[in-house]
Amino acid sequence: MPALHIEDLPEKEKLKMEVEQLRKEVKLQRQQVSKCSEEIKNYIEERSREDPLVKGIPEDKNPFKEKGSCIIS
């Protein structure tokens, strides 16, 4: 299936697509950034105690820890 190039469409088709997109966007539920950012911040802070990227991985449970040294003789 060939790619659709907007610039190749007639003006009427472009306007139809734009109206279609605007109809989809107007149905979206919107929230204030201040409220959403506070919720995201709380979510992150609540889970940071279990986050291995924040608290680290215990040495005994680290799957990437070298098991021993390599000796070439």
From Swiss-Prot:
<comment type="function">
    <text>Guanine nucleotide-binding proteins (G proteins) are involved as a modulator or transducer in various transmembrane signaling systems. The beta and gamma chains are required for the GTPase activity, for replacement of GDP by GTP, and for G protein-effector interaction.</text>
</comment>
<keyword id="KW-0636">Prenylation</keyword>
<dbReference type="GO" id="GO:0005834">
    <property type="term" value="C:heterotrimeric G-protein complex"/>
</dbReference>
<comment type="subunit">
    <text>G proteins are composed of 3 units, alpha, beta and gamma. Interacts with beta-1 and beta-3, but not with beta-2.</text>
</comment>
<keyword id="KW-1003">Cell membrane</keyword>
<feature type="lipid moiety-binding region" description="S-farnesyl cysteine">
    <location>
        <position position="70"/>
    </location>
</feature>
<dbReference type="Pfam" id="PF00631">
    <property type="entry name" value="G-gamma"/>
</dbReference>
<comment type="similarity">
    <text>Belongs to the G protein gamma family.</text>
</comment>
<dbReference type="InterPro" id="IPR036284">
    <property type="entry name" value="GGL_sf"/>
</dbReference>
<feature type="propeptide" description="Removed in mature form">
    <location>
        <begin position="71"/>
        <end position="73"/>
    </location>
</feature>
<dbReference type="InterPro" id="IPR015898">
    <property type="entry name" value="G-protein_gamma-like_dom"/>
</dbReference>
<dbReference type="InterPro" id="IPR001770">
    <property type="entry name" value="Gprotein-gamma"/>
</dbReference>
<keyword id="KW-0807">Transducer</keyword>
<feature type="region of interest" description="Disordered">
    <location>
        <begin position="54"/>
        <end position="73"/>
    </location>
</feature>
<feature type="modified residue" description="Cysteine methyl ester">
    <location>
        <position position="70"/>
    </location>
</feature>
<keyword id="KW-0472">Membrane</keyword>
<keyword id="KW-0488">Methylation</keyword>
<dbReference type="GO" id="GO:0007186">
    <property type="term" value="P:G protein-coupled receptor signaling pathway"/>
</dbReference>
<keyword id="KW-0449">Lipoprotein</keyword>
<protein>
    <recommendedName>
        <fullName>Guanine nucleotide-binding protein G(I)/G(S)/G(O) subunit gamma-11</fullName>
    </recommendedName>
</protein>
<dbReference type="GO" id="GO:0031681">
    <property type="term" value="F:G-protein beta-subunit binding"/>
</dbReference>
